[in-house]
Amino acid sequence: MEINSIKKDNMIRMNLLYPIISIFAFASSLRFLGYKVAFLVALMILAAPFFAKRKFLTLNLFLIGYPFLPDMITLMGAFAILFLYIVDIYIYKREKIVLSTFYVPVALVFVFILINTFTSLDIFGSLRDFSMNVAGIAIFLAIVTSIKTKEDYNKIATSLAIGAAFVCLWGILQFKFFGTVQREWVDADVSSQISARAYSVFMNPNVFAEYIVLLTPIVVSLFWAHKDGFKKFVFLGITGLLLLSLLLTFSRGGIMSVGVSALVFLFFNYRPLIALAIPFALLGMNFLPESIRNRIMSITNVKDSSTSYRFKIWSITKDVVKDHPQVGVGFGHKPFKETFETYIRSMPIFHAHNTYLQVMAEGGYTGFITFLVVVVVSIVQTIRVIYNTKNTIVKTFACGVLASIAGILVHGMFEDIIYINRIIMMIWIVLALSTSLTTISKQEN
């Protein structure tokens, strides 16, 4: 009775503390964020007790809707969700910290981007990318803390699939009724064949393709793992939406990356299907519209305008890396853009169209090594789950995550995958799924 009384008193004190914290937050953030944002921050803190009791639901709703949210709301939402879990761990004692070896590379990333931000050639320019990556780490920690079983993983992955369905439906509607194409999106030689490209909420078809590359293997793994016929039908439908949207982006890098993802998924999950998948894919090419088929066939054409444009960007970016080899020009795209334009004024670009060159330009060889550590550890831990788990469902989920990582790494050869905030967030989500499966595998074994 005495223990229950103490717990009740603590909860009363905490509930009284929220209004005080919200008033303080409103007053302190009013000057820097403006009235509307400051009011929203205060409102979120006031609502914390309600959402704290439903934090897993809140996390899932965030994962469904965040692609449609403004960056600032996404940022605040990510920190608010982590705050709910921290309160539950340290105040209410309803959650426990889930320990993982992957926290080491995550901590390494945080320390590096913090230093790289404040040693940047444009500190304020770097803060945008720094804050979004920290928000991504916040969601990473929330997901890893919340997923304790394969059922929890299934709920999180299903929320991502539902969000992907909405994003793709909007992309298809946008392509059909509001279709547009900007000059820089299409090669001059084929501009007459492509009158529109799908971009959904991402405002760029290549970025939309990055999102699809990350999500498609996750959704396929859900389809593969579920035995229920209705659920299989739903996930198959979402997979169809993702693949249709990918074709409507006309992103050659995206199509190639999803192809690699498919091979990785089948190699680790069911190798005999590879022999059927490749000829089936080649046969399917004949049924595609001519504009899409020609776009895919142009992958091998290194002389088209967009490819030659990229070659020139890569060449200049290599010069940036040579001139800033140790720690780069600073974290984020703004320091890179400002530095790049000192080399050539006639190419006002935002990034290097290659993640690996971009990372070296921003962070030097130190940043590139940090990036490699995260990539290698995430791949190794996921492969270990595949080979060590005794549960076929967990193995299938892990194959989906590994295929997602492999696909986005391939896509990173043609685009900067850590430039747009929505993609940065999704990458941290995929890393969280990988880490969670490692924990589940160890517990079940």
What are these model-derived regions, one by one?
Residues S200, L243, L248, W314-K318, ...:
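A conserved mid-to-late transmembrane alpha helix and its immediate loop/hinge
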Residues F32-V37, D71-A78, R128-D129, S200-I212, ...:
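Membrane-interface micro-motifs in multi-pass membrane enzymes
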Residues L169, F175-F178, L266-S305, S315-D323, ...:
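A membrane-periplasm/extracellular boundary helix in multi-pass inner-membrane enzymes
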